[in-house]
């Protein structure tokens, strides 16, 4: 019952999709769920300091020799992802959670909430990947992005050494996302950064194995757009699409809801076992 109440609170704190609404205060920390962790401070290439939590695999779990960096969505802070961290830690993964600039306890950053995303968030994801690699140079390092986090996470994976990429509710076409929300809530503009004009060039540059998890009823980040990106990959690029029931918010529970997490963990293990990702671990 306590876990259910905490999960409901996490959803409430996270707020609506595609509205950049960072929170400074953590509603919980990993040890709220009994997870062993340490607090870190990361430094980006442009000298911004980011708050982070490094969560250890749960006692008795089989060591996967893999660190998963989690890039969260566009609201709340890294506390919103502690249930995902608990699932991954319980399966034997080390997990690095971090706050984007302007989120949580990271350095301040001026944010216009009408933006879909900021390119600087990709810089933050790169810093998290680099720190995970520095701490475990002989192990695999992957990135898991949720919604906006999958957009900036894919940019990071395209330009930084990454052994596996997992995206949940992936905005394959930022322009389609904007068009969708302009139809259903025309009173509120959504602004794309200039860099979004060339975002379609990012996916072909992601050479690590990539797992797409997409909601079958997601009207914002559609399964059709996700399949188009996956099918456009070259034969050398390993891509797997896992459809899950539900809309955009429901798909975000891929690694925290009991009815979805086992399938998603199994897909992650398959991808890590592929030759492209199995060189370490």
Q: What label would you give each PLM region?
A:
Residues 5, 15-44, 48-57:
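An N-terminal hydrophobic leader/cap segment in hydrolases
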Residues 206, 212-214, 218:
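Short beta-strand/loop motif that positions the catalytic acidic residue
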Residues 74-87, 100, 224:
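The serine-hydrolase catalytic nucleophile loop
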Residues 114-135:
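Alpha/beta-hydrolase active-site loop
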Residues 88-108:
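Conserved alpha/beta-hydrolase
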Residues 84, 208, 222-232:
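Short alpha-helix in the alpha/beta-hydrolase fold that links the catalytic acid
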Residues 237-281:
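C-terminal catalytic histidine-bearing segment of alpha/beta-hydrolase fold enzymes
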Residues 151-196, 202, 253:
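Hydrolase active-site cap/lid region
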């Amino acid at each position: 019952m306590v876990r259910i109440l905490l999960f409901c609170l996490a959803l409430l704190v996270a707020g609506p999709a595609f509205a950049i609404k960072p929170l400074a205060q953590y509603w919980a920390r990993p040890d709220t769920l009994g997870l062993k962790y340490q607090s870190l401070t990361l430094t980006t290439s442009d000298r911004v300091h980011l708050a982070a939590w490094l969560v250890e695999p749960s006692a008795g779990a089989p060591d996967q020799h893999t660190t998963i960096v989690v890039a969260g969505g566009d609201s709340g802070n890294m506390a919103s992802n502690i249930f995902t961290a608990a699932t991954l830690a319980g399966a034997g993964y080390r997990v690095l959670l971090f706050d984007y600039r302007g989120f949580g306890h990271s350095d301040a950053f001026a944010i216009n909430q009408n933006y879909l995303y900021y390119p600087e968030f990709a810089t933050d994801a790169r810093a998290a990947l680099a720190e995970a690699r520095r701490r475990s140079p002989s192990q695999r390092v992957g990135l898991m992005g949720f919604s906006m986090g999958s957009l900036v996470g894919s940019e990071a994976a395209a330009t930084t050494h990454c052994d596996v990429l997992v995206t949940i509710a992936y905005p394959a076409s930022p322009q389609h996302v904007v068009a969708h929300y302009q139809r259903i809530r025309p009173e509120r503009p959504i602004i794309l950064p200039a860099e979004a004009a060339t975002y379609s060039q990012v996916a072909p540059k992601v050479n690590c194995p990539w797992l797409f998890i997409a909601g079958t009823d997601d009207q914002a980040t559609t399964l059709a757009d996700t399949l188009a990106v996956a099918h456009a990959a070259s034969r050398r690029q390993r891509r797997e699409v896992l459809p899950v029931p539900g809309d955009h918010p429901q798909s975000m529970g891929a690694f925290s809801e009991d009815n979805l997490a086992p399938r998603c963990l199994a897909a992650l293990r398959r991808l890590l076992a592929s030759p492209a990702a199995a060189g370490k671990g």
